[in-house]
């Protein structure tokens, strides 16, 4: 694969795939369930737990219904992409590997001010936290750099290193674009013509924003949340080849989390209820995490 400086959003992704593949990572595909962040992919949340080594990289579409702006905000989206890397156990040269990835996508580290700003990471919905840093390039955050300490309320041992790149924000910086919808999605010199990020996603942002804020029936969302909540212990109670169905159960946790985000966007969750819903999702995730670790340690 060519290692020339990427010219588009899609070639930036391909460059990161190429780079992390050469570092020994398995290049995965996005998880096919709605998630609020790339970290929630089972390749990170579950694979971070247990004793086995694991190195992977992937793109994950992420949905945050409350962040929709009908396509009128130049850098705020309800649907966007994150690039995730998980390295377990975390290598001693993890920072150098990360900086190498920035050079691979065309950032000259000699002319840009790269800073690691302490910002410990926490996701209470999945009972996870880690020691972390925001990575700033010339004063703008472009990545998150974390050493996982706990996931699902369980200690991560060996410690896993995680990198999260906000792809749209990073691409806007690399290509010098002020509006996300003006990003070149494919190479500008494509024989079939240039396509922008807006050509691909602007209408989706408009329609999904309307659905998120006004379209979904709140009563149905609450009913579906309760159904997902009921399914998790049922899945974990079933087994195949003496293994509880952790992966299907975790998918139900992700669905419950997305339903919560939709209800929140609709303004259907009172402040007093919010902590209760988050706690319910966290309890479900802890059940999955415990079952996963039990399987990994028995293998």
From Swiss-Prot:
Top-level division of the source organism's lineage: Bacteria
EC id: 6.1.1.14
Location of this chain's protein in the cell: Cytoplasm
Stored InterPro entries: aa-tRNA-synth_II/BPL/LPL, Gly-tRNA-synth_heterodimer, Gly-tRNA_ligase_asu
Catalysed reaction, written as an equation: tRNA(Gly) + glycine + ATP = glycyl-tRNA(Gly) + AMP + diphosphate
Transferase keyword on record: no
Pfam families, per database record: tRNA-synt_2e
PROSITE patterns (alphabetical): AA_TRNA_LIGASE_II_GLYAB (PS50861)
Entry keyword set: Aminoacyl-tRNA synthetase, ATP-binding, Cytoplasm, Ligase, Nucleotide-binding, Protein biosynthesis
Protein family: Belongs to the class-II aminoacyl-tRNA synthetase family.
Family annotation (NCBIfam families): glyQ (TIGR00388), PRK09348.1 (NF006827)
Name of the protein in its database record: Glycine--tRNA ligase alpha subunit
Organism of origin: Caulobacter vibrioides (strain NA1000 / CB15N)
Gene: glyQ
């Amino acid at each position: 694969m060519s290692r020339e400086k990427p010219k588009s959003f899609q070639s930036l992704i391909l460059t990161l795939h190429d780079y992390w593949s050469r570092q020994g990572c398995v290049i995965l595909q996005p998880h096919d369930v709605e998630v609020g962040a790339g970290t929630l992919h089972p390749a990170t949340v579950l694979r971070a737990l247990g004793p086995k080594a694991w190195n992977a990289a992937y793109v994950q579409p992420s949905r945050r219904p409350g962040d929709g702006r009908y396509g009128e905000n130049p850098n705020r989206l309800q649907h966007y992409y994150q690039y995730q890397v998980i390295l377990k156990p975390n290598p001693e040269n993890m920072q150098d590997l990360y900086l190498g990835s920035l050079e691979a996508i065309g950032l000259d580290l000699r002319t840009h001010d790269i800073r690691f700003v302490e910002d410990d990471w926490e996701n209470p919905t999945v009972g996870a936290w880690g020691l972390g840093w925001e990575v700033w390039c010339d004063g703008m955050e472009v990545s998150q750099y974390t050493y996982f300490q706990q996931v699902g309320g369980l200690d991560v041992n060996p410690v896993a290193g995680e990198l999260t790149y906000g792809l749209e924000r990073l691409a806007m910086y690399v290509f010098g674009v002020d509006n996300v919808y003006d990003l070149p999605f494919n190479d500008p010199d494509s024989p079939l013509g240039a396509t922008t990020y807006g050509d691909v996603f602007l209408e989706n942002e408009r329609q999904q924003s309307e659905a998120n804020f006004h379209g979904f029936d709140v009563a149905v969302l609450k009913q579906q949340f309760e159904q997902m909540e009921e399914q998790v212990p049922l899945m974990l109670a079933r087994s195949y080849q003496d293994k509880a169905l952790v992966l299907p159960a975790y998918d139900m946790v992700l669905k419950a989390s997305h339903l919560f985000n939709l209800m929140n966007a609709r303004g259907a969750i009172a402040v007093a209820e919010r902590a209760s819903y988050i706690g319910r999702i966290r309890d479900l995730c802890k059940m999955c995490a415990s079952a996963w670790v039990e399987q990994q340690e028995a293998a």
